[in-house]
């Protein structure tokens, strides 16, 4: 289930709630992902959040659907430091032609680092 970017981002599945369409993932950003200030570059943070929301749809549909992201909005709340961070993603609403998702990125001690909302086109996977 992990997307191809999983290895780069240090993707680690924590848990999935299929009925609720939620997922928790740990990421492990390292020094390759830092900006000149020594914090994780914003595009990497956005990728982590995107790589949390789409697997939430996959979980909700029992592995039948992924989403092609058509809109991604990220709010950067606090700088993300290298090391383990936790992302929580969920499907907010699933329609036939568009799915709406959201995710939060948290420090290990539970501080909100970033939040994202996304819409995507559901794509049925080959059976």
Residue ranges and their predicted role:
Residues 1-127:
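Terminal targeting signals and extreme-terminal segments of soluble enzymes
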């Amino acid at each position: 289930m992990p997307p191809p970017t999983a290895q780069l981002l240090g993707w680690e599945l924590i848990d999935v709630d299929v009925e609720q369409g939620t997922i928790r993932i740990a990421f492990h950003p390292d020094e390759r992902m830092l900006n000149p200030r020594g914090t994780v570059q914003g595009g990497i943070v956005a990728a982590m959040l995107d790589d949390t929301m789409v697997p939430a749809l996959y979980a909700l549909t029992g592995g039948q659907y992924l989403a092609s992201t058509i809109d991604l909005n990220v709010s950067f709340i606090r700088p993300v430091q290298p090391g383990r961070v936790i992302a929580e993603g969920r499907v907010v609403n699933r329609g036939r032609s568009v799915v709406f998702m959201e995710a939060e990125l948290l420090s290990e001690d539970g501080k909100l680092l970033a939040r994202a909302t996304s819409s995507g086109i559901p794509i049925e996977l080959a059976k």
